[in-house]
């Protein structure tokens, strides 16, 4: 085993995760239609502070993420500080690491705590797939810049005469990788073919995710960590996630056609996570600061790791790469874990990562390790369902997973939890958390 890297301050304090909260997650263009990510972020941070009863001046830093950014609010973190009644002097900056964005926000606050520059901070993320930065064509954009510099009406008219009707069409945000042009679903199809993952296996995992998420809500396990969202026109609040299919049968999944490879594919809308709106945040402190304030932490951050691989083939293998590093830095093995929570971008991606975590060949030939990371125990894996059921507001998912895992660990009497995700650009993230 490699070097253990304890996450402690210079005084020996552990990094405490005091509390966490999220909005309900809503499918694109449903309950949060027209609500920008910055407002979702304000909503969750404001409620998190109100519930914690922590004085606003205690929070010294806010690191927040947004993947689909809006030009009018490029620093969502600072807008949240200014819009929630927090101390105006609170340091705030924004981060983006695609689907692992709130992992990055949490790591950044943890690093500030370990460096001793702060003693308490908030980390999280928000995204809206319903309020999007709809752009213009490159040709129209160039003409508009030139028109702004033109001095006479004739010069302006000459510039506009270069445009064709197609140049005036709005341009939605790209859904493909900038470097390769591949959509996420194309990569999921690659992975299904590379690792021999069948349509039936993907549908079964998706069905499992929805069943377990529906059961978690039915059992009241998510009430403490999900706020009620009051949104314009304030006629009906959103209390629960609205993507979960609690009454579906496995046979229903087989009815859908492939969404990406129409002829030979196995990835469908039902075995993929949907476009989603929502926000999530956590409060982190040094262990001693939490004690001073009389707070009992949800748990502690034990380790984290980020990785990157090539984007052309099977790029959503982040968990298989980052998990062994995070476990190594925590001084743990897979068998030491009480819970494993993996982001389900696609059922194919999830199953591929599970397969590789237990692969001796992958460990030896690709990772350069002597042994496989370890088989994933199904009884520990995504026990409350995953992103296929809950949805995936890109920047919020990591904070959701960490809060959810810590609450479940406490219900089970404590232990260690692994939280891990793939991300666009071939990125991966993993964190080990501990509850007592």
Swiss-Prot record:
Taxonomic superkingdom: Bacteria
Gene Ontology terms for molecular function: acetyl-CoA C-acyltransferase activity
Record-annotated active site: 99, 392, 422
Catalytic reactions of this protein: an acyl-CoA + acetyl-CoA = a 3-oxoacyl-CoA + CoA
PROSITE patterns linked: THIOLASE_1, THIOLASE_2, THIOLASE_3
UniProt cross-references to SUPFAM superfamilies, sorted A to Z: Thiolase-like
Top EC class for this record: transferase
Location(s) in or outside the cell: Cytoplasm
Pfam families named among the record's database cross-references: Thiolase_C (PF02803), Thiolase_N (PF00108)
Alphabetical GO biological process terms: fatty acid beta-oxidation
Entry's Gene Ontology cellular component terms: cytosol
Alphabetical keyword list: Acyltransferase, Cytoplasm, Fatty acid metabolism, Lipid degradation, Lipid metabolism, Transferase
Annotated pathway: Lipid metabolism; fatty acid beta-oxidation
EC number, UniProt record: 2.3.1.16
Quaternary structure annotation from Swiss-Prot or TrEMBL: Heterotetramer of two alpha chains (FadJ) and two beta chains (FadI).
Function: Catalyzes the final step of fatty acid oxidation in which acetyl-CoA is released and the CoA ester of a fatty acid two carbons shorter is formed.
PANTHER family named among the record's database cross-references: ACETYL-COA ACETYLTRANSFERASE, CYTOSOLIC (PTHR18919:SF107), ACETYL-COA C-ACYLTRANSFERASE (PTHR18919)
NCBIfam families noted in UniProt: AcCoA-C-Actrans, FadI, PRK08963.1
Family: Belongs to the thiolase-like superfamily. Thiolase family.
Protein name from the UniProt record: 3-ketoacyl-CoA thiolase
Protein's organism: Escherichia coli O7:K1 (strain IAI39 / ExPEC)
Gene name of the record: fadI
């Amino acid at each position: 085993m490699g070097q253990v890297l304890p996450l402690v301050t210079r005084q020996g304090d552990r990094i405490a995760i005091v509390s966490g909260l999220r909005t309900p997650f809503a499918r694109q263009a449903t309950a949060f239609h027209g609500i920008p990510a910055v407002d979702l972020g304000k909503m969750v941070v404001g409620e998190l502070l109100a519930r914690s009863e922590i004085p606003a001046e205690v929070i010294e830093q806010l690191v927040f993420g947004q993947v689909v950014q809006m030009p009018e609010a490029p620093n969502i973190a600072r807008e949240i500080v200014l819009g929630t009644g927090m101390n105006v002097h609170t340091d705030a900056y924004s981060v983006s690491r695609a689907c692992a964005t709130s992992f990055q926000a949490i790591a950044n606050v943890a690093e500030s705590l370990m460096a001793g520059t702060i003693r308490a901070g908030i980390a999280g993320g928000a995204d809206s797939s319903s309020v999007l930065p709809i752009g213009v064509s490159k040709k129209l954009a160039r003409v508009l810049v030139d028109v702004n510099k033109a001095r006479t009406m004739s010069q302006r008219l000459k510039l506009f005469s270069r445009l064709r009707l197609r140049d005036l069409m709005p341009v939605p945000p790209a859904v493909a990788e900038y470097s390769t042009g591949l959509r996420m679903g194309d990569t999921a199809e690659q992975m299904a073919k590379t690792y021999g993952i069948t349509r039936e296996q993907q549908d079964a995992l998706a069905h499992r995710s929805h069943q377990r998420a529906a059961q978690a809500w039915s059992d009241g396990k998510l009430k403490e960590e999900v706020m009620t969202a009051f949104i314009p026109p304030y006629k009906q609040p959103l209390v629960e996630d609205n993507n979960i299919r609690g009454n579906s049968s496995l046979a229903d999944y087989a009815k859908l056609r492939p969404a990406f490879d129409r002829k030979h594919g196995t990835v469908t809308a039902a075995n993929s996570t949907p476009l989603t709106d929502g926000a999530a945040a956590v409060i982190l402190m040094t262990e001693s600061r939490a004690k001073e304030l009389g707070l009992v932490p949800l748990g502690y951050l034990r380790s984290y790791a980020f990785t990157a691989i090539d984007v052309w083939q099977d790029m959503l293998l982040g968990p298989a790469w980052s998990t062994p590093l995070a476990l190594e830095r925590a001084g743990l093995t897979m068998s030491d874990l009480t819970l494993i929570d993996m982001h389900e971008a696609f059922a194919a991606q999830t199953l591929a990562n599970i397969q590789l975590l237990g692969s001796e060949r992958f460990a030896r030939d690709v990772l350069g390790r002597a042994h496989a990371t370890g088989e994933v125990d199904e009884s520990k894996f995504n026990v409350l369902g995953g992103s296929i059921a809950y949805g995936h507001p890109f920047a919020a998912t990591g904070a959701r997973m960490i809060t959810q895992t810590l609450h479940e660990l406490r219900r089970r009497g404590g232990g260690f939890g692994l939280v891990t995700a793939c991300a666009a650009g071939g990125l991966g993230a993993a964190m080990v958390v501990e509850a007592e």
